[in-house]
């Protein structure tokens, strides 16, 4: 074993050379059994561990592990952990479809509200509508790069025939309704975060951007932006095939305050509040999947997961 001292203020951190050996599926099963994990079907377990890396799978074993003794709790099985894994995989598939619907709605309504108010289909290129010019510039560069790379028929047609007179640095760029088809969720979030509310003021203390936010069930733009950040975080975990079901997340604004006491979570940093946002979006016809029903179906398909709904902070009444 080798130690490598490093400097940090007056402290020394000692690192050890990583020496853990490779273990194949058979070795891993022996290891798990030595930790008191029951494996009902070893052939099945070997097959799973040959398709899913142990490093990835072991996070689903963690709820069954006694962290003090490093032994698995009584009656814990490999199959129960795989049930948790399968629940999470199916949940991600559902969320992928729902978030896709949200994303399409965001692009569409953003363009409808702003273009109709400004009468300018190239509004996203005009700095007068934004409060953070450097951030929106980076977004425009990102969109430009994507547009120039695109070989889609609709982009090729525009590039061969049209330009705009709104912004010389981006004169080859198309109207928002075209570029939005190439935008990432991050691009859209950047626009929502940097857009200036002042040019969108209406009579009677109303604002175009707040009215847009109400389409999604939020009270105002600030609240919607908070939701979008959480949606972005979940979307990124789904897109990278990361664990979703019991992770820590940011708390969205305005959600806990509208829930009755028996529907309020103890911890506000779990996925349940994200599910509540999806409920609101369903009621506002932004998405066509009822997340509450989808979760009930998943729990019926994977009944062992019911033992861990507290890890998602889902109140029992929400499932009744």
Question: What is each stretch, according to the model?
Answer:
Residues 2-9:
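Short, small-residue-biased leader/transition segments that mark boundaries at the very start
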Residues 10-320:
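Amphipathic alpha-helical interface elements
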């Amino acid at each position: 074993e080798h130690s490598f001292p490093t400097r940090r203020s007056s402290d020394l951190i000692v690192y050890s050379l990583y020496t853990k050996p490779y273990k194949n599926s058979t070795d891993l099963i022996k290891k798990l059994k030595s930790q008191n994990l029951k494996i009902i079907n070893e052939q099945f377990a070997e097959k799973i561990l040959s398709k899913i890396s142990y490093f990835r799978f072991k996070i689903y074993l963690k709820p069954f592990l006694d962290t003090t003794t490093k032994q698995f709790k009584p009656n814990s099985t490999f199959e129960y952990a795989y049930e948790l894994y399968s629940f999470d995989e199916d949940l991600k598939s559902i969320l992928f479809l729902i978030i896709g619907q949200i994303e399409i709605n965001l692009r569409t309504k953003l363009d409808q509200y702003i273009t109709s108010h400004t009468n300018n289909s190239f509004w996203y290129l005009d700095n007068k509508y934004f409060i953070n010019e450097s951030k929106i510039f980076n977004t425009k560069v990102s969109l430009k790069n994507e547009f120039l790379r695109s070989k889609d028929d609709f982009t090729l047609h525009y590039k061969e025939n049209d330009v705009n007179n709104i912004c010389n640095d981006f004169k080859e760029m198309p109207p928002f309704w075209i570029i939005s088809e190439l935008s990432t969720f991050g691009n859209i979030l950047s626009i929502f975060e940097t857009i200036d509310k002042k040019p969108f003021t209406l009579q009677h203390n109303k604002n175009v951007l707040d009215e847009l936010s109400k389409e999604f069930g939020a009270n105002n733009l600030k609240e919607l932006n908070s939701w979008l950040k959480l949606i972005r975080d979940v979307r990124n975990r789904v897109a990278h095939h990361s664990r979703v079901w019991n992770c820590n997340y940011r708390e969205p604004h305005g959600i806990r305050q509208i829930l009755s006491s028996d529907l309020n979570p103890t911890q506000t940093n779990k996925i349940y509040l994200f599910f509540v946002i999806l409920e609101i979006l369903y009621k506002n016809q932004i998405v066509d999947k009822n997340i509450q029903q989808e979760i009930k179906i998943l729990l019926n398909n994977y009944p062992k997961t019911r033992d861990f709904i507290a890890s998602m902070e889902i109140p029992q009444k929400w499932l009744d």
